[in-house]
């Protein structure tokens, strides 16, 4: 039986019931991504999920992933990055999430992720974008296990350097991936940890024709109604029974949980973006208490109703 959720109800189910198995068998460590979660929200008849160290098997019981990291503990630093490639007969989605990849490379990235959608174009020779993608993965010792040349990487949206926090420079690794100075057609959803209340997401994402929907403010403060509002589901400090973070100054605080949706009018697409960032040493969680960072970019899915 299909379930329908509001945005708020969905996030509560994901966060609070995931461990109980009510919706998903939700277990994740620093190195593993749950395939069931991806299958649930990226549903497509010909969906394939290629993950770094898949935790659960696919729907057929067979693990499918195209890359793996050679050295998880390079020079004493845990490998924290999640690279996920999702392919269907129509598009390829390359999702990158970085948090302290090693002790020596872009360790100040905080909690950025990038969702890149690439249309399928049939078999073609490698172009500049496939070359950069391979260079990017090679830079992080990601060993490819299949070919990506059948996707039209030339049509990739190139504007990825968006709202990087002042004093943090991790753009060099992305310049290998694509030329950010050239405007091309395509789609990309970019989320960085520096987005703050009151910022114009449409302008930041450089989306011309779209509407942006925001989650309701749990505190119901009327003065925040016109701002970009985030939900802080775990905002209550049990010791003091007070909120940990003040929403009015959230841009100066560690982001704990945020969610918003972006709806495109041309082409007709909709994204539900869920992320969390507890920037302490347990940001990525444990097997018993998983990190919420597994909810990356979720494509709009007619199977579910996120009204």
Stretch-by-stretch model annotation:
Residues 1-307:
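PLD/PLD-like phosphodiesterase catalytic module centered on the HKD motif
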């Amino acid at each position: 039986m299909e379930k329908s959720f509001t945005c708020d109800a969905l996030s509560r189910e994901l966060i609070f019931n995931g461990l109980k198995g009510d919706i998903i068998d939700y277990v994740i460590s620093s190195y593993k991504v749950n395939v069931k979660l991806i299958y649930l929200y990226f549903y497509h008849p010909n969906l394939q999920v290629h993950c770094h160290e898949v935790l659960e098997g696919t729907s057929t019981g067979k693990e499918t992933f195209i890359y793996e990291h050679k050295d998880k503990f390079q020079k004493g630093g845990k490998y924290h990055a999640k690279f996920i490639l999702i392919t269907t007969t129509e598009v390829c989605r390359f999702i990158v999430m970085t948090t302290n990849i090693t002790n020596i490379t872009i360790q100040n990235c905080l909690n950025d992720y990038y969702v890149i959608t690439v249309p399928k174009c049939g078999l073609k020779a490698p172009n500049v974008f496939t070359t950069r993608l391979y260079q990017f993965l090679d830079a992080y010792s990601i060993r490819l296990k299949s070919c990506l040349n059948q996707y039209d990487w030339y049509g990739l949206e190139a504007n990825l350097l968006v709202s990087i926090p002042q004093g943090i420079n991790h753009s060099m690794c992305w310049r290998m991936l694509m030329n950010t100075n050239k405007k091309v057609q395509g789609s990309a959803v970019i989320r960085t940890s520096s987005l703050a209340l009151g910022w114009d997401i449409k302008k930041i994402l450089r989306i011309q024709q779209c509407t942006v929907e925001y989650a309701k403010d749990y505190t119901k403060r009327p003065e925040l109604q016109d701002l970009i509002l985030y939900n802080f589901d775990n905002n209550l400090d049990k010791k003091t029974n007070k909120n940990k973070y003040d929403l009015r100054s959230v841009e100066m605080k560690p982001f704990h949980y945020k969610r918003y949706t972006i709806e495109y009018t041309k082409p007709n697409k909709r994204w539900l973006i869920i992320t969390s960032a507890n920037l302490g040493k347990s940001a990525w969680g444990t097997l018993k208490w998983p990190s919420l960072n597994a909810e990356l970019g979720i494509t709009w899915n007619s199977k579910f109703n996120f009204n």
